[in-house]
């Protein structure tokens, strides 16, 4: 299944939600899988311009785009999605 990296930044509303209910992160992950077929494989809170780095798997880029637009429409998070190519696949294509 294709892998994507989602860099996410909380809005003020999103930060307020997490302070009140830290478990919301896990709830959103479950919603992504249940409602959109996007599985969170790994997730890290990070310091810097982004708040989280998320590694997700989905059927295709359109599926991830749909899920991320849905999240953005809530007003709690902004995302940037990158398609990840396994290095072994890249090497094979370069030969």
From Swiss-Prot:
It holds the Pfam family GYD. It comes from the Bacteria. InterPro entries: GYD/TTHA1554. Interacts with glutamine synthetase (TTHA1329) and cystathionine beta-lyase (TTHA1620), but proteins do not form a ternary complex. Binds to glutamine synthetase and cystathionine beta-lyase. May be utilized for the efficient use of nitrogen in the global nitrogen regulation of T.thermophilus. This is Glutamine synthetase and cystathionine beta-lyase binding protein.
């Amino acid at each position: 299944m294709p892998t994507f990296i989602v860099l996410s930044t909380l809005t003020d509303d999103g930060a307020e939600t997490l302070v009140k209910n830290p478990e919301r992160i896990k709830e959103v992950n479950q919603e992504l899988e249940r409602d959109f077929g996007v599985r969170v494989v790994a997730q890290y809170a990070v310091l810097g311009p982004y708040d989280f780095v998320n590694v997700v798997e989905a059927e295709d880029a359109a599926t991830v785009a749909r899920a991320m637009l849905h999240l953005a429409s809530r007003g709690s998070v902004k995302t940037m999605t990158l398609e990840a190519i396994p290095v072994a696949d890249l090497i094979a294509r370069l030969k």
